[in-house]
């Protein structure tokens, strides 16, 4: 039978600590040559919505150790509104019932069957933050106690969980442009983690004196400036442009979860003039590619760092930077397999016939 799991099931089955451990193992597999990642692919078309475009995304990866291959797909309607003076990338819940469409398909490389279909919402935010946690665990100072968090959305919340899972944080200072939102975020995360979470009036105030600086926003531009960065800080971002050029220049070394050149992604779009100026992943990746070329002498892969092929932090005064990048298929494969195994053991989820997803005729 093929198991169908939703976001609520994933939240019930997956802790941040276990997510981080699963991702660590996956990145070690990658470094040992027993994992495979296909480039992320984004395809764009116009839609009937005048201020939005259609986007279809796929990411794939497999792990020989677990005997699985995962594919994550998203069918999205994307807009770029100006919010609080900043251009944001916002997905619209345009599916029937005001819902989003994002799915993870997990296949067995032994029996070939489709093991599970998982909605990707909660697993997505966990694997992004979990990778952030892996980087902080191995690169941030051991005595890190204070974190600055720029962002107060769904991805920022799990970033807080991840940092608290790998360092005994006592305080998180959070900034986002909307005062009510950052206050509500601080109250919620403080209750969840049992630590002090303080809303900051501006990003500079949040960063001042922090041991870890994490960016987790949907801004299309830089939100942290190098002038605010102090010796000993560990910086971590989801997209490379969240930290400005000076942050990268000041960093003693940079850890990246995946390739920062053009091998990590591909974009496709129709020739419709309405798509001429949209912000594709290629446009966002231009920043990452440029910084890779400029700073490649001090960039190492997370997989190499975990295997001891490159040194970790050697000095408490070093400034380190973790570039999360655009995601890898092995992240979905490792975490989805963990969730699937636990769901099977607990009898959670809905089963449907596996035969619905196979055929007797030659494909």
Predicted region positions:
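N-terminal ligand-binding/catalytic initiation module
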Residues: 1-125, 131-133, 143, 329-333, ...
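Glycine-rich Rossmann-fold phosphate-binding loop(s) that bind the pyrophosphate
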Residues: 151-153
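NAD(P)-binding Rossmann-fold cofactor-contacting core
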Residues: 166-190
């Amino acid at each position: 039978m093929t198991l169908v799991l939703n976001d609520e099931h994933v939240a019930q089955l997956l802790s941040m600590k276990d997510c981080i451990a699963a991702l660590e193992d996956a990145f070690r597999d990658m470094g040992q040559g027993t994992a495979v990642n296909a480039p992320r692919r984004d395809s764009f078309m116009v839609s009937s919505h005048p201020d939005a475009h259609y986007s279809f995304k796929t990411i794939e990866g497999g792990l020989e150790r677990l005997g699985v291959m995962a594919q994550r797909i998203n069918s999205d309607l994307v807009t770029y509104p100006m919010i609080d003076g900043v251009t944001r990338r916002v997905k619209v819940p345009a599916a029937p019932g005001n819902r989003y469409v994002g799915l993870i398909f997990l296949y067995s490389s032994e029996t070939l069957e489709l093991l599970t279909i998982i909605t990707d919402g909660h697993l997505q935010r966990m694997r992004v933050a979990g990778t952030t946690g892996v980087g902080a665990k191995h690169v941030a100072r051991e005595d890190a106690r204070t974190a600055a968090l720029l962002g107060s959305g769904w991805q920022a919340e799990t970033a807080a969980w991840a940092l608290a899972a790998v360092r005994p944080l006592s305080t998180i200072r959070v900034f986002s442009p909307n005062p009510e939102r950052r206050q509500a975020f601080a109250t919620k995360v403080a209750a969840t983690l049992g630590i002090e979470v303080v809303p900051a009036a501006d990003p500079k105030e949040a960063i001042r004196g922090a041991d870890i600086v994490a960016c987790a926003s949907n801004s299309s531009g830089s939100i942290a400036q190098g002038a605010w960065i102090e010796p000993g800080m560990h910086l971590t971002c989801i997209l490379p442009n969240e930290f400005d050029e000076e942050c990268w220049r000041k960093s003693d070394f940079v850890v990246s979860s995946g390739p920062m050149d053009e091998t990590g992604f591909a974009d496709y779009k129709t020739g419709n003039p309405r798509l001429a100026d949209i912000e594709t992943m290629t446009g966002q990746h231009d920043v990452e590619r440029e910084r890779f070329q400029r700073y490649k002498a001090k960039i190492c892969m997370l997989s190499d760092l975990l295997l001891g092929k490159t040194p970790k932090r050697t000095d408490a005064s070093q400034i380190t930077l973790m570039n999360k990048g655009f995601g890898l298929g092995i992240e979905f494969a490792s975490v989805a397999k963990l969730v699937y195994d636990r769901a099977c053991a607990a009898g959670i989820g809905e089963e449907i016939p596996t035969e619905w997803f196979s055929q007797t005729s030659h494909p």
